[in-house]
């Protein structure tokens, strides 16, 4: 998985310190106040470290009925194949991602997982740093959301949890609406190495409908690079969409009011990587076969839909 923005900042700050170029230090000998960059990076790292105990089963139990009702009425969420997920033990759930920063597919699946397996089963969802540091971050943490990193995911898996990861991240979630029915992980294979290292099965989770909750126009990757957002905030894109209440929404930093598109999620059969690919598996082959299978499943879901939004 990619290095977090805070991790990159900490690494840069450390290199500056070693090279004597730390802008936060003054005078000969490097005396003076610590680098603002280092202090900021350390603070962000502390906030984003996976606190698995932040997940609150009682809180989930209290809020699940109303949240599921609201989600069902607005998105008409339908989740199929939950019985394919192993009943216990660690598992890596790998999904395609849609809907900008609102990500209704995550909401629908998270609620369904807790309803099906019970709130006591440990279940964590990996999310972008900006989500965890937003005003709704504390609420999401209580539902099991942690910052997306290899370390956080491994910690949860080692603890016996089910972990939901979206390899496509901010790239896939902001793909243009006319590419709605496309799996696009942007070549990111960290989830495969994570599953191999942790010795857990992969369960693909394919969803459709999220990219109909707004009109997504562009990833905005050139603009993000020009503004150095990839370095500062770990953002590879500065997407543009047409959505309420902003009409023209640049960055989707504050989210948007999603259109009530029907969200359908299909859970696929679990994959034991060692059993299927041997003790020295080819990561490229695994990636190609998993994404191809997920694309075929997404194509089937797309064929079922009659009209955008209505499903």
PLM features: what roles do these ranges have?
Residues 2-152, 220, 254, 299-311:
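Membrane-anchoring hydrophobic helices of lipid-metabolizing enzymes
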Residues 126-128, 166, 205:
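Generic beta-sheet signal
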Residues 139, 155, 193-197:
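Hydrophobic/aromatic ligand-binding patch that stacks against planar heteroaromatic rings
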